[in-house]
């Protein structure tokens, strides 16, 4: 199981993501603070920041941007993925400062990508929903879905594969084509319970078990 960081370190990263976005929306400046955790400056994992709007008891994606294979170090990747999620996701208008009180920040730390080199028909047997994220690549096309996505949608491995292909702007069955490369990875995910509130580490295996009941 990929868990490189403590809850204290994960909490720092989520707080950092929110703080740099608030600073950027207030002043237009991006500031990379110092870290009391040396690992965050030496590790170079992939990082994604996700921002979700709260609507009653439901959450709606507001922005998600990241670096699948890292950017300088975990600290820098968190800072710039947070700015990307708030203001550079082409699917959404830029986040407004007044929205900060009604959005949740989530930071996902990605393990190195692992290329699957088996018969594509065996992919559904290998992929574990609640553990794996997927990356599909073929020619100039690529698509990534984080491990929490199939859990939140309660997808089967086959549905997860199909939607990752679609994310790459490829046919839904592209994963069966041997010209398509499929990578799996794991992620450690830290999330706010409420806007600016307590941070916890998500347990996707338990979440997926609940969705199947």
From Swiss-Prot:
This is Protein PAE0745. PANTHER family: AMME SYNDROME CANDIDATE GENE 1 PROTEIN, AMMECR1 HOMOLOG. InterPro entries: AMMECR1 (IPR023473), AMMECR1_dom_sf (IPR036071), AMMECR1_domain (IPR002733), AMMECR1_N (IPR027485), AmmeMemoSam_A (IPR027623), Uncharacterised_MJ0810 (IPR023472). It holds the Pfam family AMMECR1. Residues 8-201 form the AMMECR1 domain. NCBIfam families: AmmeMemoSam_A, TIGR00296 family protein. It comes from the Archaea.
């Amino acid at each position: 199981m990929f868990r490189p960081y403590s809850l204290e370190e994960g909490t720092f990263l989520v707080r950092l993501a929110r703080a740099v976005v608030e600073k950027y929306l207030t002043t237009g400046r991006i500031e990379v603070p110092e870290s009391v955790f040396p690992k965050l400056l030496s590790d170079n994992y992939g990082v994604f920041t996700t921002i979700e709007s709260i609507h009653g008891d439901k959450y709606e994606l507001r922005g998600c941007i990241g670096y699948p294979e890292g950017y300088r170090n975990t600290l820098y990747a968190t800072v710039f993925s947070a700015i990307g999620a708030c203001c550079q996701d082409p699917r959404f208008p830029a986040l407004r400062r007044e929205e900060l009180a009604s959005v949740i920040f989530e930071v996902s730390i990605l393990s190195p990508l692992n290329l699957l080199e088996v018969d594509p028909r065996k992919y559904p047997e290998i992929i574990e929903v609640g553990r794996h994220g997927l990356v599909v690549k073929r020619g100039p096309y690529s698509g990534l879905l984080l491990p929490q996505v199939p859990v939140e949608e309660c997808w089967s491995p086959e549905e997860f594969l199909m939607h990752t292909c679609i994310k790459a702007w490829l046919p839904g069955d592209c994963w069966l084509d041997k010209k398509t490369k499929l990578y799996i990875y794991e992620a450690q995910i830290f999330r706010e319970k409420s806007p600016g509130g307590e941070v916890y580490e998500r347990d996707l295996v338990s979440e997926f078990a609940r969705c199947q009941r």
